[in-house]
Amino acid sequence: MSDSLRIIFAGTPDFAARHLGALLSSQHKIVGVFTQPDRPAGRGNKLTPSPVKILAEHHGIPVFQPKSLRPEENQHLVADLNADIMVVVAYGLILPAAVLAMPRLGCINVHGSLLPRWRGAAPIQRSVWAGDEKTGITIMQMDIGLDTGAMLHKIECAIQPEDTSATLYDKLAQLGPQGLLITLQQLAAGTALAEVQNETQATYAEKLSKEEAKLDWTLSATQLERCIRAFNPWPVSYFIVDEQPIKVWQAQVLPAGEDAEPGTIIHADKHGIQVATADGVLNITQLQPAGKKAMSAADLLNSRREWFIPGSQLV
């Protein structure tokens, strides 16, 4: 059997486009690309193609953008391509059982965690949020469940104390294509080994929300610092002062000092704005007022010191 596979690629964001790029540089043939419909974006809300569509069209690959793969006429789009396998990376649409069964080798997915931990929509962010020491990439055979399929390949990645979701995203976007190419080689050769997931170890990575990004001072400083890193670059943690949302991009955990109600400003100087929490002190070092660029605590205090008077409360 040839080690060159006929591949349908399904994906939408930049993370997916990096995997498509690796496939385009391989011996495999991309026979079609599925991506989500163009969406309004930018200040003018202009219809904008996904990064995957842009890359596919640049290489002259047929692009399909159905709103759903449930209708039979859309499923025929997959069947007619006569693919050996379908590779799915952050596509954003559910694949019905009929579609999963169409390619000769089925459908495989690149997932941004070490399954079965962090199944679901936001695995990278939740691993930072939870304080995990490691995460990684899992390549799995897709079934009708939510990230429940048998695992074909895993690559681990340490989470550093300073990692944000943005930096971890970049690390996994480099590891994922490596694991994908190895898995495809094994599938083509018939040497791939599938490991069933242990359901007792499964956890779920719920989608992030803007509401969740509001800093809750009744949490510990450690958990708040994790939230700040997990919600970077979106939706970005924030608090309210003078009825204005202030985004927080960087902060440090300090040991507890004087007793104070959570949310109380303990101290504010060029080194940061220190806020009492349920356990420990959060020292905020980089902030972004509404309509402004991100700036150091020192720069914000120069213009808005009245917002951060020691003893006052943040909401």
UniProtKB/Swiss-Prot annotation:
Enzyme Commission designation: 2.1.2.9
Pfam family, one: Formyl_trans_N
Keywords: Protein biosynthesis, Transferase
Binding-site list for (6S)-5,6,7,8-tetrahydrofolate: S113, L114, L115, P116
Cellular component terms (Gene Ontology): cytosol
Gene Ontology BP annotations: conversion of methionyl-tRNA to N-formyl-methionyl-tRNA
Enzyme class label: transferase
Reactions accelerated catalytically: L-methionyl-tRNA(fMet) + (6R)-10-formyltetrahydrofolate = N-formyl-L-methionyl-tRNA(fMet) + (6S)-5,6,7,8-tetrahydrofolate + H(+)
CDD domains reported in the protein's UniProt record: FMT_core_Met-tRNA-FMT_N, Met_tRNA_FMT_C
GO MF annotation: an example: methionyl-tRNA formyltransferase activity
Record-stated family: Belongs to the Fmt family.
Name recorded for this polypeptide: Methionyl-tRNA formyltransferase
Species this protein is from: Yersinia pestis
